[in-house]
């Protein structure tokens, strides 16, 4: 059963214009009557052919907002009206222009745009005898430009040297349009004789030829998916239409459909990454867009966007200038007759805010695949590719797990030799004669004790071990009953005692805090007496040349500047001396802090 609704991810593409407050305005476009777009755009700049003496055109940063001054710098390009401009696909600062003065010139725009009028081109290409109608850059080879003149002759130029690589003749009448295929090996032309021709880029020979549209008005043709040709033109009754043709039989269209009746030439724009085609009529208010694929009828209508102002100039942005965070698929810059640049953004609706890989395959890169010399040698190559959003593509790419093979280190070890090792069962105890004699009891070593109240680590003698039998005969000591504080008694009724009355043996019952403070004082006194003994023991002999009573002097004396320990025992001895000095300082600091705390408490409670 055939599907009623066509399945496509571009079926719901919609257009959302940017507000006029965020667009450029007051641009004076040229008034010449020539079937050209008068505009071209890249991710950095947008160029318009404007009014003025000779053939000037303006180059404006693409992110400029607001009114463009009348004295804004421009490119004073030609002596006669400029007919067409085209940006280089590999350098966003290089632009080519053609004119009625029979010349084609190449310009280099500064990175920050023009700050003064530019009148000196980087390269001037002279060879045509009449006006240069149209130009096209080679999509793969660097610095290769194709121009078509009014004398029905085309030139393939090496822009880097300014030399003509190839002269192509054979068209009996005026050439209206030229367009390269995917890899630049061929290009298609439309001519005033109503024929569509496909030519070889290296030799200039006609590969395929066929009749196009019947109308006498200009028609255009471009390469689309799988080498097919999409052409736009007129019927004998001035009805505009498009047709999809196979290169082997250009005279018989695969699909042909009428659009409307009008006099404006229809310009096709093709996005090779998505397969979308946009048909823009000169002087129209509508933009139609279609999808080209391999499913019949091959060209599927999507929608039409209509505005109130007709378009005077149109530019199609490359995929490198899209906003992939918003799922923007294409962007068209339309200059209206009022001088306002409308920015038309085309989006694919998606619920997810993540980068959509199916909408953004790798697009054409700014790195050329061929040089001009390689192209002239007859080489062809596919264009280089780059991700639309390199950061998002790298973040979403799944890391590849690589298992590194390492050498087996244990395989180099020799196996253990077989020896008769006596084994012993752990269930059998050795005889009493083989039991080791008990070790003599040594004096208990001091163990670190942490004081919960002061947070100080002290060294105390470990209590002697008790026999297991005494543990059973030990009686439990009943807990000490503490005096309960009446919670209903106000603090003002509490009678505070002095320190002397509190310390006396008959001074009455002491609180838990008082008992803890008294015990701490006793402990400090014992530590002081013990430290004095240790200092006397560890103190080095007095030196006649270096003697100091201050702690700093003791450190210097203990360290003996210039003395280098000769063995581990001397190093440990020096460390013990320094530890003794540090402990002395710590005790002095604690005593000073306690004295300050006692004084503050005495002052607060008037002891």
From Swiss-Prot:
GO terms for biological process: actin filament organization. Residues 473-489, 517-533 have a biased composition (Basic and acidic residues). One of its GO terms (molecular function) is actin filament binding. Gene3D superfamilies: YVTN repeat-like/Quinoprotein amine dehydrogenase. Residues 424-436, 544-559 have a biased composition (Low complexity). It comes from the Eukaryota. Pfam families: DUF1899, WD40, WD40_4. Residues 437-447 have a biased composition (Pro residues). WD repeats lie at residues 77-117, 127-167, 170-209. Belongs to the WD repeat coronin family. This is Coronin-like protein cor-1. The gene is cor-1.
């Amino acid at each position: 059963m055939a599907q009623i609704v066509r399945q496509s991810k571009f079926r719901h593409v919609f257009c959302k214009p940017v507000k006029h407050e965020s667009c450029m305005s007051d641009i004076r476009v040229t008034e010449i009557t020539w079937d050209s777009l008068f505009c071209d755009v890249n991710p950095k700049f947008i160029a318009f052919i404007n009014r003025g003496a000779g053939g000037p055109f303006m180059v404006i940063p693409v992110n400029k907002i607001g009114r463009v001054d009348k004295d804004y710098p421009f490119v004073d390009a030609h002596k006669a009206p400029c007919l067409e401009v085209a940006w280089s696909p590999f350098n966003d600062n290089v632009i080519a222009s053609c004119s009625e003065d029979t010349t084609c010139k190449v310009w280099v725009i500064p990175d920050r745009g023009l700050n003064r009028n530019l009148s000196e081109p980087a390269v001037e290409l002279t060879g045509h005898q009449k006006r240069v109608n149209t130009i096209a850059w080679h999509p793969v080879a660097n610095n290769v430009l194709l121009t078509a003149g009014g004398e029905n002759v085309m030139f393939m130029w090496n822009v880097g040297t300014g030399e003509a690589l190839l002269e192509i003749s054979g068209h009996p009448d005026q050439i209206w349009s030229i367009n390269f295929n995917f890899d630049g090996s061929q290009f298609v032309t439309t001519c005033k004789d109503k024929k569509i021709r496909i030519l070889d880029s290296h030799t200039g020979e006609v590969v395929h030829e066929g009749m196009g549209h019947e109308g006498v008005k200009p028609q255009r043709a471009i390469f689309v998916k799988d080498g097919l040709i999409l052409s736009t033109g007129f019927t004998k009754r001035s009805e505009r239409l498009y047709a999809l043709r196979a290169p082997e039989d250009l005279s018989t269209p695969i699909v042909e459909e009428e659009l409307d009746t009008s006099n404006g030439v229809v310009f096709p724009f093709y996005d090779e990454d998505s397969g979308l085609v946009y048909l823009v009529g000169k002087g129209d208010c509508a933009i139609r867009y279609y999808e080209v694929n391999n499913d019949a009828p091959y060209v599927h209508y999507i929608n039409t966007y209509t505005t109130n102002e007709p378009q005077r100039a149109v530019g199609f942005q490359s995929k490198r200038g899209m906003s992939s965070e918003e799922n923007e698929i294409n962007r068209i810059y339309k200059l209206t007759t009022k001088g306002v640049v409308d920015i038309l953004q085309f989006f694919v609706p998606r619920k997810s805010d993540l980068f959509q890989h199916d909408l953004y395959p790798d697009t054409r890169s700014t790195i050329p695949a061929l040089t001009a010399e390689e192209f002239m040698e007859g080489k062809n190559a596919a264009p280089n590719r780059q991700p639309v959003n390199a950061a998002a593509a790298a973040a979403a790419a799944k890391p590849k797990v690589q298992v590194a093979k390492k050498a087996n280190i244990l395989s180099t070890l020799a196996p253990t030799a077989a020896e008769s090792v006596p084994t012993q069962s752990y269930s059998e105890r050795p005889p009493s004669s083989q039991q080791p004699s008990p070790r003599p009891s040594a004096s208990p070593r001091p163990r670190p004790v942490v004081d919960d109240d002061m947070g100080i680590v002290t060294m105390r003698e470990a209590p002697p071990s008790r026999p297991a039998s005494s543990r059973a005969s030990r009686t439990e000591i009943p807990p000490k009953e503490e005096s309960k504080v009446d919670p209903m008694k106000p603090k003002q009724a509490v009678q505070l005692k002095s320190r002397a009355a509190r310390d006396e043996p008959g001074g009455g019952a002491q609180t838990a805090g008082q008992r803890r403070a008294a015990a701490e004082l006793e402990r400090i006194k014992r530590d002081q007496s013990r430290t004095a003994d240790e200092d006397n023991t560890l103190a080095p002999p007095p030196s006649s040349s270096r003697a100091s009573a201050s702690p700093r002097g003791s450190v210097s004396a203990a360290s003996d500047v210039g003395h280098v320990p000769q063995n581990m025992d001397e190093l440990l001895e020096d460390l013990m001396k320094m530890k003794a000095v540090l402990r002395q300082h710590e005790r002095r600091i604690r005593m000073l802090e306690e004295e300050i705390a006692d004084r503050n408490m005495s002052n607060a409670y008037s002891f």
